[in-house]
Amino acid sequence: MELFNKEFSDAHNSLADARACGECYPYLKNHVNEFKSIGVNKVIIKASDVAGTTGCHPFRKPDEIINELWHKYFPESCKTQTREQVAMGVLTSMGSTEKILNDANGFKANTTAEVQKKLRGAYYDLERSGLSGPDTVAAKDYIKKTLYTNFGTQNEQRTADEDSAYLIRDDTFYSLDVCEIMGTKYQVVGRIDRLQVHENGSKTIVEIKNRMDGLFNVVRDYEEIQCQTYLQMVPNISFCRLVEQHDVYRKGYLIQKNTEKWKNDILPSLIKFCEFFHSTISKNVTNTRKHGLDSRAHKEIQTS
């Protein structure tokens, strides 16, 4: 919209999509990053978002992460609400929908069937709440994410306790420097689920995934990127064991540290994301601040 002064219509129509791509391609081809000092010493990217920054996560897109970082570090200049802000605005707009939100936040379950039952009930209530179509979709997505995330968090300890290996908690927030642009350091920060301690004293990172709809029976690309990120962040560890659990069923997958993949694939994509974010902020925030200073100076001249 801001680039072309119009909105593209008929999304997911193959002809309309092709035409839109034809208009976007020349801009993307000729796009040049613009780097300026943005007045922030450090920008932190969550380790779980690294796959999203590289475009490999089906549910976390780069533009969504950029929008969230923009809101976090430069809220005064960000014009677009995050998905969470939109959903929270919808769910708190009426007493009935706010009750659905509070129920979801406080809900505890021992099985995935209990979560699915609660979700169906929430969907039923939202569809009859009087919300518009788009608002209903936003509210449903947020309630689903809340119930699924809370279930995973609440049952992480149980999944760890049921593991046959000796697992310990590690509350350390590990960090990894990505790059530095015009005085701003970009850093990945995250905390691992558990550490497995072997008899010889060596350790393995354990990443726990509580599944809602059944076992995946495979490590998804975005999950491997998350594990590779942890293996780069945590020193002196060469393996990460991903444990997926769906109720009483579980599987484990051993992932070996792949420094070549990190250096040649993941890290370059992550750096490009940081560069694009920094360029976007350089073009928008610095102009906004300059406009604010110019307006303030103009007022001071008028009142002097």
Q: What is each stretch, according to the model?
A:
Residues 158, 166-290:
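Nucleic-acid nuclease catalytic cores
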Residues 1-36:
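Acidic, Mg2+-coordinating catalytic module of metal-dependent nucleases/exonucleases
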Residues 34-162, 296-304:
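Charged, glycine-rich intrinsically disordered N-terminal tails and low-complexity linkers that flank
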Residues 286-300:
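Non-catalytic accessory segments flanking enzymatic or RNA/DNA-binding domains
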